[in-house]
């Protein structure tokens, strides 16, 4: 029986499940369970033979998954980089809904939001790894500049890094989201319309501390192994860095590749067929502003070996 009390509004929910072209008897991977919107809808379309295997690093997501009392469903407390543990060519579809979820943002104790004061944590998996506060305590100005510039696309990254260093020297390590937001606001003097000056820095630190882009690249590569011919890859991203990786990955595996050292050899056959992209409708954006930046890209696995 599929039930639950979640209030998180899953972005592009119906569009993503439609893009998977669900086979009722198929095995599907929900690579980022979150609060289970995609898994629940998938289960409603599967037969008794179908299965959903979910992945998530967040203990709150693992707890939410316990509300799904269904033998066809299982969840692993792992990041989706571990997709390659699944048997080769065993799944009919892989769905990745990237980034941070609304419940994570809205819970001050998780430290993801500059709008709600809380401990400066930002770890998806709070059982392991450094928090943002711990990393900022010892990070060099150069390292902070690189992270904020590369992962936040913040043109004032150097100013922000020096402001953080000055704050550390004068008042000790940063401990809360409010303290970091204030430091960033003091360094970033220009304002982007409708965007808090701390937005890019918070994004950068979250992506870095969770190794989000590296994990995405590994998961995409693993999807080639686990998808069966005709299986679908559906990825929903929320910022340009993620979307660029997904776009380039699909493009790289959707064309024939010739070996310049062997010009007369047959080309390497493409492993994916690109099926385009979709954005949230105006109606969805009006009801859920966080869906505005969402981009869904879809590809189909060919029969070529990974």
Swiss-Prot record:
Subcellular localization is given as:
Cytoplasm
Which keywords does the record carry? Cytoplasm, Methyltransferase, rRNA processing, S-adenosyl-L-methionine, Transferase
Region (Disordered) residue ranges read 280-306
Q: Which reaction does it catalyse?
A: cytidine(1402) in 16S rRNA + S-adenosyl-L-methionine = N(4)-methylcytidine(1402) in 16S rRNA + S-adenosyl-L-homocysteine + H(+)
What is the annotated role of this protein in its UniProt record?
A: Specifically methylates the N4 position of cytidine in position 1402 (C1402) of 16S rRNA.
Q: Which GO terms describe its biological process?
A: rRNA base methylation
Q: Which domain of life is it from?
A: Bacteria
Q: Which GO terms describe its cellular component?
A: cytoplasm
InterPro entries referenced in this protein's UniProt entry, alphabetically: RsmH (IPR002903), SAM-dep_MeTrfase_MraW_recog (IPR023397), SAM-dependent_MTases_sf (IPR029063)
Organism, scientific name: Polaromonas naphthalenivorans (strain CJ2)
Q: Which PANTHER family match?
A: 12S RRNA N4-METHYLCYTIDINE METHYLTRANSFERASE, S-ADENOSYL-METHYLTRANSFERASE MRAW
Which coarse location class describes where this protein primarily resides?
cytoplasm
Question: SUPFAM superfamilies under this entry?
Answer: Putative methyltransferase TM0872, insert domain (SSF81799), S-adenosyl-L-methionine-dependent methyltransferases (SSF53335)
| HAMAP family, A to Z | 16SrRNA_methyltr_H
Protein name (Swiss-Prot/TrEMBL): Ribosomal RNA small subunit methyltransferase H
Q: Which GO terms describe its molecular function?
A: rRNA (cytosine-N4-)-methyltransferase activity
The residues the record assigns to binding S-adenosyl-L-methionine are 36-38, 56, 80, 97, 104
EC numbers on record: 2.1.1.199
The Swiss-Prot or TrEMBL record describes its family as follows: Belongs to the methyltransferase superfamily. RsmH family.
């Amino acid at each position: 029986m599929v039930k639950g009390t979640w209030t998180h509004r899953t972005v592009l929910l119906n569009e993503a499940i439609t893009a998977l072209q669900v086979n009722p008897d198929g095995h599907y991977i929900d690579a980022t369970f979150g609060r289970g919107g995609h898994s629940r809808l998938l289960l409603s379309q599967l037969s008794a033979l179908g299965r959903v295997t979910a992945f998530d690093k967040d203990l709150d997501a693992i707890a939410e998954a316990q509300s799904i009392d269904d033998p066809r469903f299982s969840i692993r407390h792992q990041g989706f980089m571990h997709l390659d543990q699944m048997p080769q060519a065993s799944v009919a579809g892989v769905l990745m809904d990237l980034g941070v979820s609304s419940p994570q943002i809205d819970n001050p104790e998780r430290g993801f939001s500059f709008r709600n004061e809380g401990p400066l944590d930002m770890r998806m998996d709070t059982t392991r790894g450094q928090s943002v506060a711990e990393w900022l305590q010892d990070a060099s100005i150069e390292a902070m500049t690189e992270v904020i510039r590369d992962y936040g696309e913040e043109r004032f990254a150097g100013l922000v890094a020096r402001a953080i260093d000055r704050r550390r020297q004068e008042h000790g390590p940063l401990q809360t989201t409010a303290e970091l937001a204030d430091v960033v606001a003091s360094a970033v003097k220009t304002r982007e319309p409708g965007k808090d000056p701390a937005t890019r820095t918070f994004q950068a630190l979250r992506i870095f501390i969770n190794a989000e882009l590296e994990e995405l690249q590994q998961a995409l590569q693993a999807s080639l192994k686990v998808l069966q011919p005709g299986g679908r890859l559906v990825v929903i991203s929320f910022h340009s860095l993620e979307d660029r990786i997904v776009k380039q990955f699909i493009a790289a595996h959707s064309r024939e590749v010739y070996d310049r050292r062997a010009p007369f050899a047959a080309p390497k056959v493409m492993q994916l067929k690109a099926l385009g992209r979709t954005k949230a409708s105006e109606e969805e954006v009006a009801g859920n502003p966080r869906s505005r930046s969402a981009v869904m890209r879809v590809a189909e696995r060919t029969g070529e070996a990974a």
